[in-house]
Amino acid sequence: MEGRRFAAVLILPICMLAPGAVASKRWTRPSVCNLPAESGTGTQSLKRFYYNSDKMQCRTFIYKGNGGNDNNFPRTYDCQKKCLYRPG
């Protein structure tokens, strides 16, 4: 009986800490993904991708070549890698 009580005393604090340990590893979307698409300035017409936080997906827009913000990716893969949560 004494052995069981000892095991319970050791296991209980570990179980109480586990939820906090998991919560601290929550994934949060980078703030750049919340920026609006900005065409920038210039004369080019480049197809780029931005993360649309309302639709929760990467969408295309036309980038003019200069300026804008960092929610601007050359490939849809780059946008998804940065802004879409992938468990595992």
Curated annotation (Swiss-Prot):
GO MF entries:
potassium channel regulator activity; serine-type endopeptidase inhibitor activity; toxin activity
Where would you find this protein in the cell? Answer: Secreted
As for PTM, the annotation reads: Contains 2 disulfide bonds instead of 3, as for all Kunitz domain proteins.
Which N-terminal residues, if any, form the signal peptide? Answer: 1-23
Tell me its family: Belongs to the venom Kunitz-type family.
Mention any one GO cellular component term assigned to this protein in its UniProt record.
Answer: extracellular space
State the function annotated in the UniProt record. Blocks specifically voltage-activated potassium channels (Kv) of the Shaker family.
Residues found modified as Proline amide: P87
Q: What's the protein called, per UniProt?
A: Kunitz-type conkunitzin-B1
Tissue localization of expression is: Expressed by the venom duct.
Which key words are in the record? Amidation, Disulfide bond, Ion channel impairing toxin, Neurotoxin, Potassium channel impairing toxin, Protease inhibitor, Secreted, Serine protease inhibitor, Signal, Toxin, Voltage-gated potassium channel impairing toxin
Which Pfam families is this protein grouped with?
Kunitz_BPTI
Q: Does the keyword Methyltransferase apply?
A: no
Tree of life domain: Eukaryota
Instruction: Indicate the segments forming the BPTI/Kunitz inhibitor domain, all copies.
Output: 33-83
